[in-house]
UniProtKB/Swiss-Prot annotation:
Binds 1 Mg(2+) ion per subunit. Coiled coil: none annotated. PANTHER family: SUCCINATE--COA LIGASE [GDP-FORMING] SUBUNIT BETA, MITOCHONDRIAL, SUCCINYL-COA SYNTHETASE BETA CHAIN. One of its GO terms (molecular function) is ATP binding. It is an enzyme of class 6 (ligase). It comes from Sulfurimonas denitrificans (strain ATCC 33889 / DSM 1251) (Thiomicrospira denitrificans (strain ATCC 33889 / DSM 1251)). Gene3D superfamilies: ATP-grasp fold, A domain (3.30.1490.20), ATP-grasp fold, B domain (3.30.470.20), Succinyl-CoA synthetase domains (3.40.50.261). This is Succinate--CoA ligase [ADP-forming] subunit beta.
């Protein structure tokens, strides 16, 4: 689950992570009132959406008067903001964050993410703050510092020293401040079951203070039961409607850009299926894991969600029955053909528990556009061929 910048900064405040003062607004009038409340002569008007690249997309603007705050708020609030992370459809801006200006001397990058290969959190930092960290990683990877932190010992002084030396910070007072900053950020990450925390930019001010000028946070959905205060921050309007609908039926769904719909049981098999489709020359339109409790209703709902995507030219159902029974999947496919206009070829590979019964169910139904596959490679090849033929 992701949250907005203004919410991330509320959490920063609880942990003593320094940020500029700011207030959220849902109207132009409220934005101007917030600027008056904050005081000063310079404010930053920020679009609040769940995506990075807001500044380059025109969603972060500097205002030097209350009139300018009003003008910029009118421009940004209600706009469809397109960034490199939103896709071409963009996101509707429904909230603003009005923040006091900061005396920026230097921009850095600081984040904490989970390194799945090392199986531990990693602190990432760079002197290239304010830029897309993906671009820095691609073009100049040597400018990114990565410090693995073993959860068994937590953030220690030697981690902090590696951080400040790596960033070239030599002033003892500044070193102490940044080490304290990073220590608080790591504590926040661990105590809240975060998956990712990113501050870009982390700025050093003219007085040598460090401030989180931005804040992105993502949390482990499976751990939200331990953090009701964070779950209350969920903004459903920022989430994909199909993903939310799938979740109601116990389906894990992620929309992608390809043209072959995928329905698989198990995340590992789902990723392997998508890799095989790519290897065969196709592109997956989605990730859809029906899980171990799939029945006819959930399978039918999966078809309905997949077919909402007009790009889908074929569907590949790849089930290896262990907990989930293949005959239930077969009945779900039949149910889907009754409830939904399944107008594309459906390639079906069923193996494992009750696979023979499932094959008989589909064979007896004799549905013209349901095509049997013998294994993963055969199914992927047939799906790619069917999608190509439908173009």
């Amino acid at each position: 689950m992701n949250i907005h910048e203004y919410q991330a900064k509320q959490i920063f405040a609880k942990y003593g992570v320094p940020t500029p003062k700011g207030l959220m607004a849902e109207s132009v009038k409220q934005a101007v009132a917030n600027a008056e409340t904050l005081g000063g002569s310079i404010w930053v008007v920020k679009a609040q959406i769940h995506a990075g690249g807001r500044g380059l997309g025109g969603g972060v603007k500097l205002a030097r008067s209350l009139e300018e705050v009003e003008q910029l708020s009118k421009e940004i609030l209600g706009m469809t903001l397109v960034t490199h992370q939103t896709g071409p459809e963009g996101k509707l801006v429904q909230k603003l964050y009005i923040e006091e200006g900061a005396d920026i001397k230097e921009e850095l990058y600081l984040g904490v993410v989970l390194d799945r290969a090392r199986e531990m959190p990693v602190i990432m930092a760079s002197t290239e703050g304010g830029m897309a960290i993906e671009d820095v990683a691609h073009n100049t990877p040597e400018k990114i510092i990565k410090i693995a932190v073993d959860p068994a010992i937590g953030f220690q002084g030697f981690h902090g020293r590696e951080l400040v030396f790596g960033l070239g910070i030599t002033d003892p007072n500044e070193q102490k401040k940044l080490i304290s900053f990073a220590s608080k950020l790591y504590k926040l990450y661990m105590e809240n079951d975060a998956e990712m925390i990113e501050i870009n930019p982390l700025v050093k001010t003219g007085s040598g203070e460090f401030l989180a000028l931005d804040g992105k946070m993502g949390f482990d959905d499976s751990a939200l039961g331990r953090h009701p205060d964070i779950e209350d921050m969920r903004d459903i309007s920022e989430e994909d409607a199909d993903e939310r609908e799938a979740g109601k039926y116990g389906l894990s769904y992620v929309s992608l850009d390809g043209e072959i719909g995928c329905m698989v049981n198990g995340a590992g098999l789902a990723m392997g299926t998508m890799d095989t489709i790519n290897y065969m020359g196709g592109t997956p339109a989605n990730f859809l894991d029906v899980g171990g409790k799939a029945n006819a209703e959930t399978v039918a709902k999966g078809f309905e969600i997949i077919l909402k995507n007009p790009k889908v030219k074929a569907i590949f159902v790849n089930i290896f029955g262990g907990i989930v029974r293949c005959d239930r999947i077969a009945n779900g496919i039949l149910e889907a053909t009754k409830l939904v206009d399944v107008h594309v070829p459906v390639i079906v590979r069923l193996d494992g528990t009750n696979a023979e019964e499932a094959a008989a169910i589909l064979r007896d139904a004799n549905i013209a556009n349901v095509i049997a596959a013998t294994d993963l490679a055969d199914g992927a090849a047939k799906a790619v061929a069917a999608a190509a033929q439908a173009k």
